[in-house]
Curated annotation (Swiss-Prot):
UniProt keywords, alphabetically: Developmental protein, Disulfide bond, Glycoprotein, Glycosyltransferase, Golgi apparatus, Lipid biosynthesis, Lipid metabolism, Membrane, Signal-anchor, Sphingolipid metabolism, Transferase, Transmembrane, Transmembrane helix
The protein, known as: Alpha-N-acetylneuraminide alpha-2,8-sialyltransferase
Binding of substrate, residues: N154, N176, P177, S178, S262, T263, G264
GO biological process, one term: protein glycosylation
Binding site for CMP-N-acetyl-beta-neuraminate: N131, N154, S262, T263, G264, W284, H298
Membrane topology: Single-pass type II membrane protein
GO molecular function, one term: alpha-N-acetylneuraminate alpha-2,8-sialyltransferase activity
Function: Catalyzes the addition of sialic acid in alpha 2,8-linkage to the sialic acid moiety of the ganglioside GM3 to form ganglioside GD3; gangliosides are a subfamily of complex glycosphingolipds that contain one or more residues of sialic acid. Glycosphingolipids are required for convergence extension movements during early development. Can catalyze the addition of a second alpha-2,8- sialic acid to GD3 to form GT3. Can use GM1b, GD1a and GT1b as acceptor substrates to synthesize GD1c, GT1a and GQ1b respectively.
Catalysis: reaction(s): an N-acetyl-alpha-neuraminyl-(2->3)-beta-D-galactosyl derivative + CMP-N-acetyl-beta-neuraminate = an N-acetyl-alpha-neuraminyl-(2->8)-N-acetyl-alpha-neuraminyl-(2->3)-beta-D-galactosyl derivative + CMP + H(+); a ganglioside GM3 (d18:1(4E)) + CMP-N-acetyl-beta-neuraminate = a ganglioside GD3 (d18:1(4E)) + CMP + H(+); a ganglioside GD3 (d18:1(4E)) + CMP-N-acetyl-beta-neuraminate = a ganglioside GT3 (d18:1(4E)) + CMP + H(+); a ganglioside GD1a (d18:1(4E)) + CMP-N-acetyl-beta-neuraminate = a ganglioside GT1a (d18:1(4E)) + CMP + H(+)
Record Pfam families: Glyco_transf_29
Topological domains, Cytoplasmic: 1-15
Length: 345
């Protein structure tokens, strides 16, 4: 415990300054502990989490302050998805993941957008569910489902073997176009199986970055037309590239250096503006849990992400600072303890 991690004890847990200064104070404290922008390793991060302890208290002042920052930079209530209101006919829509590529909005494309933001805002309590292996055996399913609005990322499995840990309810699920290409052959031959697999997400919004890269447009449009042809009760929303671009700039200014943010961080960013309270699950980018046990990368498999695309430890650090300052709650331990493993009193 005398490693550099012991310097964490110099950072106070409570009585932080109020307003936007509190988060800045935490960042300065972290830079003192890890000078030269050295990211903490797994063991150091575990010490930090365990030192902070299980207690968490929301800070309404900090919540409102951070929500205003997101509103000023990115306007999620208005720009989260493409709508007829925010995307006029004839607009030159620039893709956020391609240099110098744009699409002129015509009647055909604009007809795919809802009239306005479909959510009744503000949303109350939101669960944002990442897919991290730390969710396995977490028994967080019931707690996740208690939220008013549940966001999930990239079509995660919700079969019976996982529901105790991740729940069953979904109000919004994201779909990376690469999933449509690799798993469903771009819906050229697998439309029926795709529709059947999406039934587990019930009457949810399906959120896709159709206008981020040229390669993502066709698969996203195929999803829209497939769900329409089969008369499903799901609604496709297309991510607004202006929103994605601005969120990327927002986090880059706060020290996240990556080619692209993870889907999870995009969703958390949206939730912090759209929801009154946010709890996040499955956000833990390390190979061992808080008890020192090895865990898989996802709760359902151990497929690793492409190297060099995301900066998951940097993202986690920012989310952890928001947890400490009371802006959001990060669930890293079991939601329900395993009674069979506890000693009788």
């Amino acid at each position: 415990m005398k490693l550099q991690g012991s310097r964490m004890w110099l950072c106070p847990r409570t009585r932080l300054p109020v307003g936007a200064s509190a988060l800045g104070f935490l960042i300065l404290c972290w830079l003192y502990v890890f000078p030269g922008y050295r990211l903490p390793g797994h063991k150091e991060m575990v010490r930090e989490v365990l030192r902070f302890g299980p207690g968490w208290r929301k800070n309404r002042t900090e919540m409102d302050s951070f929500r205003k920052l997101l509103q000023d930079c990115c306007d999620p209530p208005h720009l989260f998805s493409l709508t007829k209101v925010n995307t006029p006919l004839g607009e030159n829509l620039w893709f956020d993941g391609e240099f110098f590529h744009s699409l002129t909005i015509d009647n055909s494309t604009r007809s795919l957008f809802p009239q306005d933001t479909p959510f009744k805002l503000p949303l109350k309590r939101c669960s944002v569910v990442g897919n991290g292996g730390i969710l396995k055996n977490s028994r967080c399913g019931e707690q996740i489902d208690e939220a008013d609005f549940v966001m999930r990322c990239n079509l995660p499995p919700l079969s019976r073997e996982y529901t105790e840990d991740v729940g069953t309810r979904t109000q919004l699920v994201t779909v990376n176009p690469s999933i449509i290409d690799k798993r469903y052959q771009n819906l050229l031959w697998s439309r029926k199986s795709f529709v059947e697999n999406l039934r587990v997400y019930q009457q949810s919004y399906v959120y896709m970055p159709a206008f981020s890269t040229k390669r993502g447009t066709d698969p996203s449009l195929r999803v829209y037309y497939t769900l329409a042809d089969f008369g499903t009760n799901q609604t496709v929303l297309f991510a607004n590239p202006n929103f994605l671009r601005n969120v990327g700039k927002f986090w880059k200014s706060r020290g996240i250096h990556s080619k692209r943010l993870s889907t999870g961080l995009f969703m958390v960013s949206a939730a912090l503006s759209l929801c009154e309270e946010v709890t996040i699950y499955g956000f833990w980018p390390f190979q061992m849990d808080l008890g020192g046990r090895y865990i898989s990368h996802h709760y359902y498999d151990n497929t690793l992400p492409l190297s060099g695309v995301h900066a998951m430890p940097e993202e986690f650090l920012q989310l952890w600072l928001l947890h400490k300052s009371g802006v959001l709650q990060m669930q890293l331990d079991q939601c329900k303890k395993d009674v069979s493993s506890q000693k009788p009193h």
